[in-house]
Amino acid sequence: GYHMFNEYGNIFLENRYTDWQNYYPYWTLRNLWMLSKYVPAEKLQIEFLNKWRNTEKYGDDPFAPHRYSFEYLFATTMAGQPLAWFEASNLPEEAFGIRDLMEKYKKVQYDFHQGTILPIGEEPSGRSWTGFQSLCHSKNGYLLIYREDNAREETWVETWLPEGAEVMCTPILGNGKLMATTVGRKGTIKVSLPEKNDFMLYRYEIR
């Protein structure tokens, strides 16, 4: 189970393969999102795959792995322990452009994982605004937010922030912009991303 033998290491959550057409980025994200309310997300190994393999098996599927950037696939695993579930020798040259994102992530990974990581926003469906909040201290933490394939460039996302709080959000990774906001009812904050299938990681501070 999820709560036994944790002293021996992280949990390998699942097998997913493009060969079998059972790897969809939003499925992986949804599993992590749903479990994170009950299981420490930072203890789960979460896979991202070689999106250039087996593209023909997915046909015109709008949620096929190759329709996402490699950076986004990696980002879906960041609340857990990212697991590169592929043979690196088979990656095309363009895949190695992800190195910059990985190096920046490694600088905040430890601090991000020190907090209590909980789901925020909508359940991942391939069409949602979703994400995670890491509550590091009473006044600060992280917000990892994803805009899936939907037409809403901005929306209100429910978080675990206290209603009425004044919050400063500083972008760390992805395409977020510096944001000062007042938390609304049910912990909602207004967020925006101009592109579909994109993400942003903020460090927030309650003033």
Feature locations, PLM:
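Short strand-edge motifs at loop-to-beta-strand transitions and within beta-strands
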Residues: 187-189
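Active-site-proximal substrate-binding groove within the catalytic cores of carbohydrate-active enzymes
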Residues: 1-180, 193-195, 199-203
